[in-house]
């Protein structure tokens, strides 16, 4: 009787200890949804900058101006605005400012240079009949009127690049005043290696458009002057493409005896 009691006594601790050991190894799993709810209640919500931008469209960075092309310049004008008043530190952000625009006219001496008639021999004509003044002529007139260093062309936006064209907005500054704003554009062909040259053409186009507000070479926008100048100095001739043999009409100066390749005069 005593022996059986011992057996029962020995078995009882084993039976009692076994569930305890197995319970210590058991880890209760918490559902993922419940865990997320508990975490959100205990810890403050942390929102990343990307999530904030998604929630508020106004905080999103503007889409790159080169969204239709596979490359970009990333040449947006730097932020030069200061917390202080611009009149205190003489710091003007020309990418955003209209300082001096239309404030007062230039002197009579400068106006006479800007409004002087252009020479007939300085005008050129494109094959499609468009008259133009070479860019260097505009720069010489500006240098004569304001002096070298007295004027400048500043970019006001990032370059907009597409698969076949580049454009950018520029502002013409003369004697510390904004004079004119224009967007230049230039077509290009041949891939990315042609974009840099096209950007210079875009700048030249913007300079020409800004100079129009100063009255430089204003005759080139006068239909009467255009008709008279064409009749006196130009002629329209039939030409043939040397490769595909297509025929068309092109304009040229009477002083130019030859048609440029790939055309030949009929």
Curated annotation (Swiss-Prot):
Residue numbers spanned by region Disordered: 37-68
Keywords, alphabetical: DNA damage, DNA repair, DNA-binding, Mitochondrion, Mitochondrion nucleoid, Transit peptide
Domain of life: Eukaryota
A single cellular component GO annotation: mitochondrial nucleoid
Organism encoding this protein: Candida parapsilosis (strain CDC 317 / ATCC MYA-4646)
GO molecular function, one term: double-stranded DNA binding
Assembly and interaction partners: Forms homooligomers in vitro.
Residue stretch of the organelle transit peptide: 1-23
Subcellular location: Mitochondrion matrix, Mitochondrion nucleoid
Name of the gene: MGM101
Family affiliation: Belongs to the MGM101 family.
Protein name listed in UniProt: Mitochondrial genome maintenance protein MGM101
Pfam families membership: Mgm101p
Disulfide-bonded cysteines: none
Free-text function comment from the UniProt entry: Plays a role in the replication of the mitochondrial genome and the maintenance of its telomeres. Able to catalyze strand annealing and D-loop formation. Binds a wide variety of DNA substrates. Exhibited the highest affinity for DNA molecules carrying 3' ssDNA overhangs (Y-form, 3' FLAP, 3' overhang) and for substrates with complex structures (X-O and Fork). Forms homogeneous ring-shaped structures at the ssDNA native telomeres ends.
Listed Polar residues bias regions: 37-47, 57-68
Gene Ontology biological process: interstrand cross-link repair; mitochondrial genome maintenance; recombinational repair
């Amino acid at each position: 009787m005593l022996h059986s009691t011992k057996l029962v006594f020995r078995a009882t601790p084993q039976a009692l200890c076994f569930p305890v050991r197995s319970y210590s190894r058991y880890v209760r799993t918490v559902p993922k949804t419940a865990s997320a709810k508990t975490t959100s209640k205990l810890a403050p919500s942390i929102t990343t900058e990307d999530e904030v931008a998604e929630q508020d469209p106004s905080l999103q960075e503007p889409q790159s101006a080169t969204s239709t092309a596979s490359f970009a310049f990333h040449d947006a004008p730097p932020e030069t605005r200061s917390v202080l008043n611009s009149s205190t530190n003489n710091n003007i952000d020309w990418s955003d400012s209209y300082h001096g625009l239309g404030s007062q006219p230039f002197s009579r001496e400068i106006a006479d240079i800007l409004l002087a008639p252009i020479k007939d021999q300085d005008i050129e004509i494109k094959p499609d009949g468009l008259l133009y003044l070479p860019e260097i002529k505009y720069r010489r007139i500006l240098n004569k009127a304001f002096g070298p260093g007295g004027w400048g062309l500043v970019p006001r936006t990032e370059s907009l690049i597409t698969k076949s064209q580049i454009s950018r907005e520029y502002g013409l500054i003369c004697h510390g005043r904004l004079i004119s704003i224009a967007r230049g554009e230039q077509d290009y062909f041949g891939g990315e290696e042609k974009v840099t040259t096209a950007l210079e053409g875009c700048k030249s186009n913007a300079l020409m458009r800004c100079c129009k507000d100063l009255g430089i070479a204003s005759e080139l926008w006068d239909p009467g002057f255009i008709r008279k100048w064409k009749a006196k100095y130009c002629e329209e001739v039939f030409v043939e493409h040397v490769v595909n043999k297509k025929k068309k009409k092109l304009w040229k100066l009477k002083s130019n005896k030859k048609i440029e390749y790939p055309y030949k005069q009929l």
